[in-house]
Amino acid sequence: MANKLVYTSAPKGLMPGTFGFCTVAATRGMTKTVVDALEGLAGYRRVYETTDGASLNPVAFSHLLVDTPRGRLRVLARIADALPDYSGRTNHIASFLQLGDAETHESGPAELFYTPGLFETQWPNGQPPIFYPSPVEIPMEEGACPRSCEYWRAVAGDPGWAGVLASTIETRRLAILVVPHSIDVLKLFYEAIAILPANKRWDATFATYYTNALRNVDCLWRGVVVDSPEEAQARAIAGNLVLDFRTLPSIESFKTNPAIWRWIEIAREPISKLAPTLKTPLVPAPSLQTPPPRVSVQVPPSCATVVPSAAQVSVPDPATPTPQKESTVAVPAMKTQRNSQ
């Protein structure tokens, strides 16, 4: 079971007196520490300022470890541009799951982003804020067997590159993928995680669309957009693994490094007969169309129109909350802000 929180711009937030960018839905009983930590991750930076930005800007999928005064949190986040809010201004929606160890099934974190219904993809104007009465049940499927990394073959020329990325789990080496508009970074991470041993898949923390807002969290694999500030910063730090999909070197150069070459050979293996079929993701394959002019500040990948999903849980209006047990901590009031962080 996992706590869930949704953050977007709305005329009325979950707590009395909140509006603008605020929490509009949360699992009843979440502590202030958890709420504050998730809201601190809810910022979003656009690549394109267009009338249809929600379909062109990247969707940020993240698996993060976040330190708080009361311990470390494991967080899955889906953050995306959204249609204009109730006031006509730009908007985005952030949907979070805070997981415990019992929810770390063998398929790994990326698998959950392909599971329908776990993350909110829109919050219609006028929809009232809600408390989810109980935590979200996480599907506990059998672990994925290593599969052939066909998407890596398609975009990098050799599935072995997935092994280069996977090798960083052993060394804890920071890995940065510099990607153009057309590459689906979530699919790259999904395949690389699949070749890891089942007990190592949750060691892969990642952000498909990394920005400096995430600098104080555990995030080992980072997708950054071409020519972004984050790309320049990554190259300035010695020891980082930087995979620039515009200029990948010959993969044969890794033959002199047995530790990495072993993973390259694993990634080149044919698909296992036991490997599950890849589900249809919440975000279809990115369009290869020529992107529109960018705004002055640039950022990362994974663009596409998302399939909307409305909240599925019937819950009471926060104006008349259901009585809680004394041991339950109610979701606290948050400061009213219009700033999109």
Predicted segments, located by residue:
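Low-complexity, Pro/Ser/Thr/Gly/Ala-rich intrinsically disordered linkers and tails that serve as
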Residues: 288-290, 294-341
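N-terminal module detector in large eukaryotic regulators
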Residues: 1-292
